[in-house]
From Swiss-Prot:
Principal localisation: membrane
Sequence segments annotated as region (Disordered): 1-42
Alphabetized Pfam families for the sequence: K_trans, K_trans_C
Organism, scientific name: Anaeromyxobacter dehalogenans (strain 2CP-C)
Location(s), subcellular: Cell inner membrane
Protein task: Transport of potassium into the cell. Likely operates as a K(+):H(+) symporter.
Record lineage: Bacteria, Pseudomonadati, Myxococcota, Myxococcia, Myxococcales
Compositional bias (Low complexity): 15-35
Catalytic activity from the UniProt record: K(+)(in) + H(+)(in) = K(+)(out) + H(+)(out)
Residues spanning the membrane: 51-71, 91-111, 144-164, 180-200, 208-228, 254-274, 290-310, 322-342, 380-400, 406-426, 440-460, 464-484
Domain of life of the source: Bacteria
Membrane topology: Multi-pass membrane protein
Protein name: Probable potassium transport system protein Kup
Length: 670
């Protein structure tokens, strides 16, 4: 028999009204993403030392991906399968495209606009989807937004797989520049570094995380110095800042020039991380770190590489490392490798957070979530996700062999996510901010024109490796959408077959049911109904405990719920109590700790005291069959059943003590 999620899981965020009414997939969510909760108190923007500390911290988490792009970006523009010959005019044109891509996409689009669309301070594709989903009233509209958000999230997983592989590989390739005879050790060394990186994940990053920011600070300082050194040799490269060189590049190279955008886009990979990590550092530190250090350092380095190419077109084989003086080559390789590891860690941690959000929002099966820090709630470790990412990264390195080949696979995932973000952001402008069409549409069209240009330039790389992120995204999208549909169908079936709580309580008051000592806790996703496991228990055992607690864990489309609004409790009579706990999509519930905290909370309802050794938790353990009346295609039913069978058990997910859990089985035809 398989452990399925619906009877004991929190329902998908927004699917359950907070009033305590019967809930299910068809329940209409409140029109506000706050789900009836008060907004958090305004936090003053950090200044002085606090701002500087947060900005340095942001360097280690937010800018790892985009910060390591100089390792391979220009090499791809001039030496990739669609690269152009590094003539003076082409070098100036490509560098002009690099500057304006960074300025428009990162500074203008993300810094100035997208980062304003936060979900209670949190960013990212799923947080944005949850934010705009509340304003959509039509079923078709919500479905379209859901599909967009899930596909964007699926593309981010592809990005999370490629980034560690290409960053570490690009850094280690410097060894071949310093000693060409050592080229054969590049791939094995990269694999060893990645294996150790993923093995280390279970230890957490609480201790080493403090040095991530300083490492990236040294990295940005290093690439800035290297860039200045190159510019001083040929200051004429500064002409590339004029947009006329970008325009003349397209006019001169035509379609071939357009395809070079597939390499130029590599300089803005990681732009989505600015938005996704907004909740960790805040908008101001991220902006200060970008405008004050990251962007100037990156721009100086790209211009320095360009100056080198003006002087020596043959340096296109690896302009980053050839920019360094011979005596500094090995130290640069060491710093680059450290920066690549930091960039990889940021993407791995991002995949953990994305999965946690997907679980709480109802788009992913439960997996093991371990908190690796007692002080930082966001520091988590997901073993299943870690090993899947690690295996995929190593396979990519072994399959593609070079960062140049991997670059062909990189752009599609990044640009696809950018398009999804733009489409969802348009809904924020129209529905959340109330912008008129004449104001919102020109900005959306401008963003989409740039995003689509980068995307189309990368689509032609499909056979060269672009198939990988598309295949990975399609797989993740299929899994997430199947889980969502299966959960909704199952929740609806259980709701229709259930018994309203008020009718059950009236029946209990009339009947004389034998009571036994102790406390029984029944988990239910429907606060207005009776959990099926309670009905089965009463039918077969014909007894009830002296005290029965019905616990509902409700997930909401906000990142965090204030502790003052965490729990509602009330006495139902006849020894029954109801506890409804609210969690955001960035939180993980712990039911025993929750129940233990009830006496300390100032609740309008009763003050419940739980004695752990006198408490029994009852859960349903259902066997799913694919021959039921649901309209879901049979292949999706079977896939959902497999996913449910391999999901983490409800008892483990909610932190229930194994020796105090009783499971009762039943068959359900889906």
């Amino acid at each position: 028999m398989s452990q399925i999620p619906s009877p004991n899981d929190p329902p998908p965020a927004g699917a359950v009204p907070t009033s305590g009414a019967p809930a299910g997939p068809s329940a209409t969510p409140a029109p506000s993403p706050t789900a009836g909760f008060s907004l958090p108190e305004h936090r003053p923007a950090p200044t002085g030392k606090a701002l500087a500390a947060l900005a340095v911290g942001a360097l280690g988490v937010v800018y790892g991906d985009i910060g390591t792009s100089p390792l391979y970006s220009l090499k791809e523009c001039f030496g990739g399968p669609h690269g152009v010959h590094p003539t003076d005019a082409n070098v100036l044109g490509v560098l002009s495209l690099v500057f304006w891509a960074m300025t428009f996409v990162v500074t203008f689009k993300y810094m100035s606009f997208v980062m304003r669309a936060d979900n209670r301070g949190e960013g990212g594709i799923l947080a944005l989807m949850a934010l705009v989903g509340k304003t959509e009233t039509t079923r078709l509209g919500r479905r379209v937004l859901l599909m967009l958000g899930l596909f964007g999230a699926a593309l981010l997983y592809g990005d999370g797989i490629i980034t560690p592989a290409i960053s570490v590989l690009g850094a280690v390739e410097g060894v071949a520049v310093a000693a060409p005879a050592m080229e054969r050790v590049v791939v094995p060394a990269t694999v060893v570094i990645l294996v150790f990186l993923f093995l280390f994940q279970k230890q957490g990053t609480a201790k080493v995380g403090a040095v991530f920011g300083p490492i990236m600070l040294v990295w940005f300082a290093t690439i800035a110095v290297l860039g200045v050194r190159g510019i001083l040799h040929d200051p004429s490269i500064l002409r590339a800042l004029l947009p006329t060189h970008a325009l003349s590049f397209f006019a001169r190279n035509g379609w071939h020039g357009f395809l070079v955008l597939g390499g130029v886009v590599l300089v803005i990979t990681g732009g989505e991380a600015l938005y996704a990590d907004m909740g960790h550092f805040g908008k101001r530190p991220i902006r200060v770190a970008w405008l004050g250090l990251a962007m100037p350092a990156l721009l100086l380095n790209y211009l320095g590489q360009g100056a080198l190419l003006l002087h020596d077109p043959g340096a296109a084989r690896n302009p980053f490392y050839l920019l360094a003086p011979e005596w500094a080559l090995y130290p640069t390789i060491a710093i680059a490798t450290a920066a690549a590891i930091v960039a990889s860690q940021a993407l791995i941690s991002g995949a953990y957070s994305l999965t946690q959000q997907a679980i709480q929002l109802g788009y992913s099966p439960r997996v093991t979530i371990r908190h690796t820090s007692q002080r930082e709630i966001g520091q988590i470790y997901l073993p299943e996700v870690n090993w899947m990412l690690g295996t995929a990264c190593v396979a990519l390195v072994l399959g593609f062999q070079t960062s140049s080949r991997l670059a062909s696979a990189y752009g599609i995932a990044v640009t696809g996510t950018m398009i999804v973000t733009t489409l969802l952001f348009h809904r924020v402008m129209r529905d959340r901010w109330g912008w008129a069409r004449w104001k919102a549409w020109p900005l959306t069209v401008l963003f989409l024109t740039v995003d689509a240009s980068f995307f189309l330039a990368n689509v032609v790389k499909f056979r060269d490796g672009g198939w990988f992120p598309i295949a990975a995204a399609a797989l993740v999208f299929t899994l997430m959408s199947t889980w969502k549909r299966g959960r909704d169908a199952l929740a609806l079936m259980l709701k229709d077959a259930g018994l309203p709580l008020d009718l059950f309580m009236a029946d209990v008051a009339r009947r004389k049911v034998q009571r036994v000592a102790g406390t029984a806790v029944f988990m239910t996703s429907n606060p207005g109904g009776v959990p099926p496991v309670l009905l089965h228990h009463l039918k077969h055992n014909k007894v009830l405990h002296e005290r029965v607690i019905l616990v509902s864990i409700l997930a909401h489309e906000i990142p965090f719920v204030a502790e003052a609004e965490r729990v509602n409790a009330r006495e139902l009579g006849s020894g029954f109590f109801q506890v409804i706990a609210h969690y955001g999509f960035m939180e993980t519930p712990d039911v025993p700790a929750l129940l233990d905290s009830l006496p300390r909370r100032a609740l309008a309802g009763p003050r419940l005291t739980i004695v752990p050794m006198e408490t029994t938790y009852f859960l349903g353990r259902e066997t799913l069959l694919a021959n039921g009346p649901s309209t879901i295609p049979t292949w999706r039913k079977r896939l959902f059943i497999v996913m449910a069978r391999n999901a983490q058990t409800a008892s483990a997910f909610f932190g229930l003590p194994p020796n105090r859990v009783v499971e009762m089985g039943a068959q359900i035809q889906l």
